[in-house]
């Protein structure tokens, strides 16, 4: 029973790290990356469709993305969706390809993005601590129900704390890497 709780806590903490990593990936850095456009939805024949289902996003060079639209009639809709996104991008179409030059980030914008990334990391840490709290309360519940001893509970809480520290360290590493990437000129 205790092992199940620990395994569940470890799995949930791993998911917290992955979710934090995904949130950090959405933050725009100075470099072109296809995942930058993952959140964009295109009004395609009356329904909102993810951009990657309407076209193929590739990296043209370090500061330019290219979107090869599958259906030429959707080019204007794709351009409009990119322009109306909060990414501050200005697409230029050339035939069935839309080029998106990424403007360099200003120092002020970089600092703002670092704040955003730090907030995402803190949310990840809080989520991991909540998982730890849930696991610890489950251990205490088992002790109340006389299914395990106080020593088992204390030992299990220490093991869950080690798992927690490991996952928080992973988030801190993600944060440090993202901050370095953002502040790189």
Curated annotation (Swiss-Prot):
One of its GO terms (molecular function) is ribosomal large subunit binding. This is Ribosome-recycling factor. Coiled coil: none annotated. It comes from Shewanella amazonensis (strain ATCC BAA-1098 / SB2B). Responsible for the release of ribosomes from messenger RNA at the termination of protein biosynthesis. May increase the efficiency of translation by recycling ribosomes from one round of translation to another. Its main location: cytoplasm. It comes from the Bacteria. Keywords: Cytoplasm, Protein biosynthesis. One of its GO terms (biological process) is cytoplasmic translational termination. Belongs to the RRF family. It is found in: Cytoplasm.
């Amino acid at each position: 029973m205790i092992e199940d709780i620990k395994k569940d806590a470890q799995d949930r903490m791993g998911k917290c790290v992955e979710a934090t990593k995904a949130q950090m990936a959405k933050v725009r850095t100075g470099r072109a990356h296809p995942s930058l456009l993952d959140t964009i939805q295109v009004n395609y024949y009356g329904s909102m469709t993810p951009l990657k289902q309407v076209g193929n996003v590739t990296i043209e060079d370090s500061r330019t993305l290219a979107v090869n639209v599958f259906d030429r009639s959707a080019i204007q809709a794709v351009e409009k969706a990119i322009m109306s996104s909060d990414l501050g991008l200005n697409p230029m179409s050339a035939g069935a390809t839309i080029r998106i030059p990424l403007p360099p980030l200003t120092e002020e914008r970089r600092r703002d993005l670092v704040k955003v990334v730090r907030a995402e990391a803190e949310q990840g840490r809080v989520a991991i601590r909540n998982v730890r709290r849930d696991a610890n309360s489950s251990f205490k519940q088992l002790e109340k129900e006389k299914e395990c001893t106080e020593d088992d509970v204390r030992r299990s809480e220490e093991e869950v704390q080690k798992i927690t520290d490991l996952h928080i360290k992973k988030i801190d590493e993600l944060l440090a890497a993202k901050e370095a990437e953002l502040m790189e000129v």
